[in-house]
Amino acid sequence: MKLTYQFFIFWFFLPFFAISGDDDYKNLIFKGCANQKSPDPTGVFSQNLKNLFTSLVSQSSQSSFASVTSGTDNTTAVIGVFQCRGDLQNAQCYDCVSKIPKLVSKLCGGGRDDGNVVAARVHLAGCYIRYESSGFRQTSGTEMLFRVCGKKDSNDPGFVGKRETAFGMAENGVKTGSSGGGGGGGGFYAGQYESVYVLGQCEGSLGNSDCGECVKDGFEKAKSECGESNSGQVYLQKCFVSYSYYSHGVPNIEPLSGGEKRQHTERTIALAVGGVFVLGFVIVCLLVLRSAMKKKSNKYDAY
């Protein structure tokens, strides 16, 4: 059985992980569906798959990674994992993962009547679920599933060197847990070097050393696939990487888990906007009052 991935871009924005609204982590990036369905006359496989999804969604409220096996019979058992980005809070992780089971059915088809596909993967911007039937052919953790590159080159003579340094920081960061954006449940790193913002994430099943190697391989593929493009995202079987170049410097980027800081920023903006509104209102009132007084003065001057 060979897993055939069918890829498409549902939403494209730059930078991919950096400056995005709170709901963007639920946007669909790609899906992969096996070209074979599991015969399921008794409905056992479908029930195991349903139980698998229920367990994965439940655990996503407490952690950013889990691996689950549903069923005991080798012919109907299902193995699955979910992984959330390291900068998502538990509530965001749950919100993201809980969207996927219905998407699997919608994008890959299946059900008790016509059988479910024996393996599938649905990847959103902030999380993914992948599952496979017991005994399904295993693929390399560094097999490339999907990539997207920016349409423009950086036009910066020093870009390659800056990107290389940023890549090195990420490779070390996913191994040591050193990150500007949080982590947990698989190596995660988000940070910047000069004008390059970079992100790396591994599946929680990888150890630190394997994670570093996977991310390194991802960045090598990003260089070969995207050349000097100003941005790129590469998704491998067990890790994914992203980079974005900003000609005027990386803007202030908050991790999605920085709730307090973001709320404080939002309050500051709200106060600033409110202050501008009040100031404008006062100015208008003063202008009206001045106009009225001027008319009154002109009236007296006429006598």
From Swiss-Prot:
Cleaved signal peptide residues: 1-21
GO CC, alphabetical: plant-type cell wall; plasma membrane; plasmodesma
Cytoplasmic side: 290-303
Organism: Arabidopsis thaliana (Mouse-ear cress)
Protein's gene: PDLP1
Subunit structure, interactors included: Interacts with AZI1. Interacts with PDLP5. Does not interact with DIR1.
Annotated GO biological process: defense response; plasmodesmata-mediated intercellular transport; transport of virus in multicellular host
Protein name per Swiss-Prot or TrEMBL: Plasmodesmata-located protein 1
Entry keywords, A to Z: Cell junction, Cell membrane, Disulfide bond, Host-virus interaction, Membrane, Plant defense, Repeat, Signal, Transmembrane, Transmembrane helix, Transport
UniProt record similarity statement: Belongs to the cysteine-rich repeat secretory protein family. Plasmodesmata-located proteins (PDLD) subfamily.
Extracellular side stretches: 22-268
Gene3D superfamilies reported for this sequence: Gnk2 domain, C-X8-C-X2-C motif
Residue spans crossing the bilayer: 269-289
Phenotypic consequence of gene deletion: pdlp1 and pdlp3 double mutant shows altered protein diffusion (measured using GFP). In pdlp1, pdlp2 and pdlp3 triple mutant there is inhibition of GFLV 2BMP tubule formation. Virus cell-to-cell movement is negatively affected. There is a 22% reduction in mean surface area of infection foci by GFLV and an approximately 12 hour delay in long distance movement in comparison to wild-type plants. There is also a systemic delay in systemic Cauliflower mosaic virus (CaMV) spread.
Function: Modulates cell-to-cell trafficking. Required for systemic acquired resistance (SAR) which is mediated by the signaling molecules azelaic acid (AzA), glycerol-3-phosphate (G3P), and salicylic acid (SA). Required for the proper localization and stability of AZI1 which is involved in SAR. Mediates callose deposition during downy mildew fungal infection around haustoria. Haustoria are unicellular protrusions from hyphae and function as the site of molecular exchange of nutrients and effectors between host and pathogen.
Pfam family, one: Stress-antifung
Source superkingdom: Eukaryota
Mutation effect (L287A): No effect on targeting to plasmodesma
S-S pairs: C33-C108, C84-C93, C96-C127, C149-C226, C202-C211, C214-C239
Reported impact of V288A: Retention in the endoplasmic reticulum
Membrane topology classification: Single-pass type I membrane protein
Tissues in which the UniProt entry reports expression: Highly expressed in cell suspension. Expressed in epidermal and spongy mesophyll cells, and the cell wall interface at the base of the leaf trichome (at protein level). Expressed in haustoria-containing cells.
